């Protein structure tokens, strides 16, 4: 009930509800009511599960007819846009850390790594704001924002992984970097497409007496898509987003029940993820940084 009150309060004052859930997590954390949660690996796992569900649901809501006119600029924003954002932000961090009064002096590659972790738009926040606020955006801006926010995470993820590998291996060649990008994009897109087709086939061919099991079957397919893509060295987030687009743009049995289930589950994991992130933040530790 408290979470519902927080959500209603955010909607009433025009504040994104997810931001309030982040604050609630901070208030319940070790510097607030004393709830201890400091396991970054568990938080990462929760984030992976949540983001997979959020991106799949976002893909289901993305219609080919809406994104077709803005497909090219949307892809450019989610690839080159993220790359340029990481580059310029990294250069700014490197320049700022070199100032005498900062006393940090970060190397350029470390600055680029920090910038890469924040270079993408948070798809959970964008989807939530566009849906809850019911914004009447013109010139196909809404589908472009949804496409960009849903497809830019793989680029930021790959930038981060490549830069970490570069640091750990004391340097990678340009061919290796380009090859890593190509493999993750191609394998992720191909796996998402074919497993999305397989999910459609299973939903339409399987005869299950209990209709409530169809959404559960699709949810298990989301995790299967992410896992198999990751094993093949592809990008799992791109795969689940494309698989969601395939499912959402084709005829499937029990569409209403599936959409209702996925919408509720998406909101649940958005709340869980931001509460978890809030619990990881200790305001007292930020004083020295500030």
Regions found by a protein language model. Name each.
Residues 1-290:
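Transmembrane helical cores of multi-pass secondary ion antiporters/exchangers
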């Amino acid at each position: 009930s408290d979470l519902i009150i927080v959500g209603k309060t955010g909607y009433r004052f025009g504040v994104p509800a997810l931001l309030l859930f982040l604050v609630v997590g901070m208030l319940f954390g070790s510097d607030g009511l004393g709830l201890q949660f400091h396991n970054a690996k568990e938080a990462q796992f929760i984030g992976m599960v949540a983001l997979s569900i959020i991106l799949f649901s976002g893909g289901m809501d993305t219609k080919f007819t809406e994104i077709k006119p803005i497909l090219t600029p949307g892809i450019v924003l989610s690839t080159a846009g993220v790359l340029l954002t990481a580059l310029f932000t990294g250069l700014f961090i490197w320049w700022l850390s070199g100032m005498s009064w900062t006393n940090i002096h970060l190397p350029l590659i470390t600055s680029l790594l920090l910038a890469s972790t924040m270079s993408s738009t948070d798809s959970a926040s964008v989807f939530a704001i566009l849906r809850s606020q019911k914004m009447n955006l013109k010139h196909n801006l809404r589908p472009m924002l949804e496409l960009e926010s849903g497809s830019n995470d793989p680029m930021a993820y790959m930038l981060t992984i490549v830069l970490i590998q570069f640091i750990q291996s004391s340097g990678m060649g340009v061919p290796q970097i380009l090859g890593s990008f190509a493999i993750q994009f191609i394998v992720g897109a191909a796996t998402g497409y074919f497993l999305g087709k397989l999910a459609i086939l299973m939903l339409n061919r399987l005869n299950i007496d209990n209709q409530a099991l169809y959404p559960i079957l699709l949810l298990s397919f989301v995790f299967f898509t992410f896992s198999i893509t990751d094993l093949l060295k592809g990008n799992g987030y791109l795969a689940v987003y494309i698989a969601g687009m395939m499912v959402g743009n084709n005829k499937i049995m029990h569409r209403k029940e599936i959409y209702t289930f996925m919408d509720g589950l998406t909101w649940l994991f958005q709340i869980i993820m931001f509460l978890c992130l809030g619990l990881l933040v200790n305001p007292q530790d930020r004083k020295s940084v500030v």
